[in-house]
């Protein structure tokens, strides 16, 4: 189940190896939010369940949260976002990642969308 997966709330998770994954928000989400001005990340070691709040996001337009797409333990956070939250706007699928997790249950990925399904989903929103 490697690859890039998406939620209907516009979060993404990229599975990197057997247990490790990176989490962030999509280009669609950052575009809807506008310029990000603040990101609060979880603590390394935090145990999060699927759908739990993983991060707090504030932009010039709104405040919201990133919900974790699958259950897991936070293993690393992108500390650069504290000083440069705009990295999320500039590169949401790259340097704008939020945190890494050790995935607890890969079967939870089955409820997520692949890139093609997500693209169709966001096209249906416009």
Outline where the language-model segments fall.
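Short, glycine/small-residue-enriched coil/turn segments at secondary-structure junctions
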Residues: 1-3, 66, 70
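Acidic, low-complexity mobile loops and tails
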Residues: 1-50, 86, 90-126
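Residue-level recognition of beta-strand microenvironments
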Residues: 13-15, 60, 71, 77-80, ...
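Short, charged/polar surface micro-motifs in flexible loops or helix N-caps
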Residues: 30-31, 44, 71-74, 79-82
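Short, solvent-exposed beta-edge and connector elements
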Residues: 32-38, 60, 68-71
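Short, Lys/Arg- and Gly-enriched loop/turn segments at beta-strand edges
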Residues: 58-67, 84-86
């Amino acid at each position: 189940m490697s690859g890039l997966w998406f939620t209907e709330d516009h979060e993404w998770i990229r599975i990197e190896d057997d247990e490790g994954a990176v989490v962030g928000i999509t280009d669609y989400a950052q575009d809807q939010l506008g310029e990000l001005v603040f990101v609060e990340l979880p603590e390394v070691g935090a145990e999060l369940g699927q759908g739990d709040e993983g991060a707090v996001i504030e932009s010039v337009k709104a405040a919201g949260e990133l919900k974790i797409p699958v259950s897991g333990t936070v293993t690393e956070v992108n500390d650069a976002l504290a000083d440069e939250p705009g990295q999320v706007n500039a590169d949401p699928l790259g340097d704008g990642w939020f945190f890494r997790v050790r995935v607890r249950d890969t079967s939870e990925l089955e409820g997520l969308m692949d890139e093609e399904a997500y693209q169709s989903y966001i096209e249906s929103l416009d």
